[in-house]
């Protein structure tokens, strides 16, 4: 399957992430990630994840995913627009790599059981992007815009203990974006 994968990572308050994670998962970094894909040129797909560790295995925890997502191309910009998220990526022509790939054993999906999907081996170059996003599930949702460079997601010590909340897309989308850490697109055959 021909795949264009657009990825954005953004910094959030790590204590807010800790408050929504299911039991058994530990937050690795104060980051939320949106993966938006165009599959075979006509199907849009989005995943929403956060970096975690479970039983000594580091990876991503899927918060939600959607298939059949509408998208539009205008020049170098690709926009995914739904009733819950507006996100656009514009390639800037600079190639690079993603630092989060170094400790990624896959992506956990919580279904009837917890399933770990192994990471894909992608050797294609990544093209950095300018990116802007806005969750639209409620008026308090996260939004942000990239600043033209890639920044690290630095783990933080616990400073605030928040009441436990349900692990849902709505609760994760309400955690404010402090800063977009980076965005890229990679094209590959799946």
Residue ranges of model-derived segments:
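Structured soluble/peripheral alpha/beta segments that form catalytic or ligand/cofactor-binding pockets
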Residues: 1-16, 20-128
């Amino acid at each position: 399957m021909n795949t264009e994968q657009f990825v954005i990572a953004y910094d959030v308050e790590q204590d807010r992430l800790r408050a929504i994670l299911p039991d058994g998962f530990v937050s690795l970094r104060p980051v939320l990630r949106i993966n938006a894909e165009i599959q075979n040129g006509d199907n849009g797909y989005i995943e929403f994840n956060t970096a975690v560790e479970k039983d000594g295995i580091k990876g991503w925890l899927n918060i939600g995913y959607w298939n059949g997502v509408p998208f539009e191309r205008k020049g170098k910009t690709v926009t995914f627009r739904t009733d819950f998220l507006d996100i656009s990526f514009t390639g800037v022509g600079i190639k690079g790599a993603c630092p989060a790939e170094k400790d990624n054993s896959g992506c956990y999906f919580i279904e009837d059981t917890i399933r770990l999907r192994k990471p894909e081996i992608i050797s294609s170059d990544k093209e950095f992007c300018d990116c802007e996003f806005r969750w639209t599930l409620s008026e308090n949702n996260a939004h942000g815009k990239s600043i033209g460079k890639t920044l690290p997601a630095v783990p933080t010590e616990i400073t605030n203990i928040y009441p436990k909340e349900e692990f849902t897309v709505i609760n994760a989308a309400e955690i404010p974006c402090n800063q977009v850490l980076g965005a890229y697109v990679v094209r590959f055959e799946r």
